[in-house]
């Protein structure tokens, strides 16, 4: 859409940001690459100032479908996050990702003959979602009050490794490809 698999744009007081999420291996879970999380951290730090609020987009929901969703939530919860929007299940459903208000939305071709899209309206205090089928009027499917007072997520990963004597583990983030380049 914006020529990259990461995007950021500003509309009024909103910083709208999105990043790709795998799977990067055949039949793997959804995954956000470390370089994308790094980009998200630095982008939000640079862009979210002076009363700006954040709307986040990606494909997978902020739950266990995304193997490192906790890392993503930990970045977002540092900012006044209005909502996270995702697809994946091709249906409308409100849920919480950590303490972040999230909304799953439809696909373009939800079911045969039901072509359309989602309209999201962000006001000063609310977020409203509408199902817009082609050649029909939008229908409100969900709305919620904006609450940017986020309680930090408490869930953690086990990051300890049994390293054999004489070896070390070092994280290196050099991959810039957005897909697994070979199978």
Segments from the language model and where they lie:
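Extended active-site neighborhood of metal-dependent phosphoesterases/phosphodiesterases
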Residues: 1-45, 49-50, 71-83, 93-106, ...
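Binuclear metal-dependent phosphoesterase catalytic core
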Residues: 9, 93, 97-176
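Active-site beta-loop-alpha junctions enriched in small/polar residues
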Residues: 21-22, 59-61, 108, 134
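Short acidic, glycine-rich surface-loop motifs adjacent to enzyme active sites
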Residues: 44-64
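Histidine-centered catalytic micro-motifs
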Residues: 56-61, 82-92
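Acidic-and-aromatic substrate-binding clefts and catalytic sites of carbohydrate-active enzymes
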Residues: 62-67, 110-112
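Short, conserved clusters of charged catalytic residues that mark active-site
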Residues: 67-71, 87
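Aromatic/hydrophobic beta-strand junction motif of beta-rich domains
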Residues: 179-183
């Amino acid at each position: 859409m914006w020529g990259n698999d990461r995007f950021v744009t500003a509309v009024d007081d909103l910083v709208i940001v999105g990043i790709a999420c795998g799977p990067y291996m055949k039949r793997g879970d959804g995954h956000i690459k470390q370089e994308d999380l790094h980009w998200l951290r630095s982008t939000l730090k640079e862009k979210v100032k002076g009363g700006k609020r954040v709307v986040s987009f990606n494909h997978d929901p902020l739950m266990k479908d995304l193997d490192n969703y906790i890392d993503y939530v930990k970045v977002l919860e540092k900012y006044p996050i209005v909502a996270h929007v995702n697809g994946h299940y091709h249906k409308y459903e409100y849920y919480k990702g950590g303490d972040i208000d999230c909304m799953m939305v439809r696909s373009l071709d939800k079911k045969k003959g039901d072509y359309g899209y989602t309209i999201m309206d962000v006001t000063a205090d609310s977020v409203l979602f509408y199902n817009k089928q082609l050649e029909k009027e939008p229908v409100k499917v969900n709305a919620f009050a904006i609450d940017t007072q986020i309680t930090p997520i408490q869930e953690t990963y086990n990051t300890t490794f049994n390293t054999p004597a004489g070896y070390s583990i070092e994280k290196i983030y050099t991959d810039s490809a957005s897909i697994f380049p070979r199978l």
